[in-house]
Amino acid sequence: MTAAPATPDPLRTHDLVGIGIGPFNLSLAALAHGLPTPLTTAFYEQRPAFHWHPGLLIEGATLQVPFLADLVTLADPTSPWSFLNYQRTQDRLYPFYFAERFHIHRAEYDAYCRWVSTQLPGLHFGHQVDAIRWDPQNARFDVDHTQLDAHGEAESLGRTHTRHIALGVGTEPHIPEPLKPLTDTGNAPVIHSADYLHHRDRLLQARHITVIGSGQSGAEIFLDLLRARPTGNEGLHWLARTPAFAPMEYSKLGLEHFTPDYTRYFHALPETVRDTLVPQQWQLHKGIDHDTIAAIHDELYRRTLHGGWPDATLTPGVSVRTAGRVANTRVELHLEHTQQSTRTRLTTDAVVLATGYRERPLDTLLHHLAPHLRRDTAGRPRVDAHHRLDLGPAVTGHIYVQNAERHTHGVGAPDLGLAAWRSATILNDLTGTTPYPLPKRTAFTTFGLTQPAIPTQQPTLVPLAHP
């Protein structure tokens, strides 16, 4: 049964208001729904319905985390909002069992999340949050929002009161500065990977296509284009700034960087050390999974079986210095090889920018709270171990952040595998209880040196022998 969206009550003071309904706030809403002592909650999302990266739901593309990294299981395996229960309700549990798939298709994960989003009460799609204010007299936040019609136009204004807020506004496509001139309208299509499927047919009409970016999205798009092009007339370039088309670190001990243990360790490090670590760990979250790399090589090799090499060029270690349009029908890229210190030009008919995402800035949304918001030396919001913004003593309510704290919590901040744990951490802190008991240890790796236990009796020191 689909839950009918309730009209927000303008007089009620909620316990929690969520802003943004992506996987992370959807996880929070699902676990909040299962609390033994119910919370009054409302979650707002500007989009008309839940959709998870619709432009990247490429046929056959899978998640890079196991299905256990759903919205709830790693905090509450008995929750009715688990992926396995979704499979049961769809009468697909036995087929899934026999499929023996630990990593599910992205389209299936999207369908699962949409199923949850249509069942949970208190989710308000088509609502744009405009401002957040602190009301000291009533010790609560005022959340101003606009209800949008089916065309995205303003329909009515509203205000919701709440004791606490969870920001889950997600990320937005990132386009590096040298590539921004390409985003102007022109006959040669230049699109971000986030919109790939929406423009795929138009891209395939181009004689030559260039994919820029060495991460998983770039690899999947290159593979999809390669499979769609005729042998010998592929007309593809794949450029990467990284020194290699490198695999993602997926060893079992390497994956322990995506545990609560490592998150706590990272948060306790000095700010300067954290800032040094994050870019060094790019292969933990920006590499390509082994299966995709193998599939690309297999497809390229298959195209050599009858002699000749495919018309596909894969070049790592390349940065785009400048870019522009040629006669409005083609694109010219000025390239530099970082190891050779050589430069060249590449003219192409279409470009896919698989250049990643950045956290959405919070400053506009938090404009009225700016005097209370404490920042680090780089001007970023400080976030404590419970994922709360440091707002100073004048604001007694909490604002929790989800996927806006990589600078304080490390590479696991955007990882789906930590979604349920972070949601449970937030709810335990918000309620002051432990409705979701969390494991004390989650990794075999001991990150850092632990403080030695103080012995009950001072040991006798034995002098070191001189050589």
Segments and roles (model prediction):
Residues 1-48, 96-216, 220-467:
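Flavin (primarily FAD) cofactor-binding/catalytic cores of flavoenzymes
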Residues 52, 83-86, 115:
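Tryptophan-centered motif/residue detector
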Residues 52-71, 257, 288, 292:
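Glycine-rich phosphate-binding loop and adjoining beta1-alpha1-beta2 segment
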Residues 62-82, 245-248:
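Short, solvent-exposed beta-strand-terminating loops
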Residues 74-106:
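A conserved beta-strand/loop capping segment in the N-terminal third of enzymes
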